[in-house]
């Protein structure tokens, strides 16, 4: 199976929920938002979430795994990524976003952490 992202829920009022599968060693993200916020919940595998404030440079990291379910908040103005730290297992992450993607007003800006 290739890396994948599948939208599970899509509502104009409450945003969207998707499931994301990352192969071993893969980094995803490397972007930030003006108004969107997201929650990343790793349900299987072992990964690292990195966030960096685009104005101050302050950086935070969260080691995450399916063995310890927790929600990590991606806040506006912080570029973020998620890295699969495993050499053998997929990283499975439930991702929620408070807004749906609007192609006429995109709110995703590439910037490495």
Residue spans for each PLM region:
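Glycine- and acidic-residue-biased ligand/ion/polar-headgroup-sensing regions
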Residues: 35-53
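Conserved short histidine dyad/triad with adjacent acidic residue
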Residues: 18-36
């Amino acid at each position: 199976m290739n890396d994948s992202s599948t939208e599970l829920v899509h509502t104009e009022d409450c945003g969207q929920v998707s499931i994301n599968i990352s192969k071993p060693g893969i980094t995803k993200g490397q972007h930030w938002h003006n108004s969107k916020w997201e929650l990343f919940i790793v349900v299987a595998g072992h990964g690292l979430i990195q966030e960096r404030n685009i104005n101050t440079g302050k950086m935070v990291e969260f080691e995450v795994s399916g063995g310890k379910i927790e929600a990590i908040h991606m806040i506006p103005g912080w570029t973020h990524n998620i890295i699969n730290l495993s050499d053998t297992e997929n990283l499975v992450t439930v991702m929620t976003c408070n807004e749906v993607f609007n192609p006429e007003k995109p709110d995703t800006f590439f910037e490495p952490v």
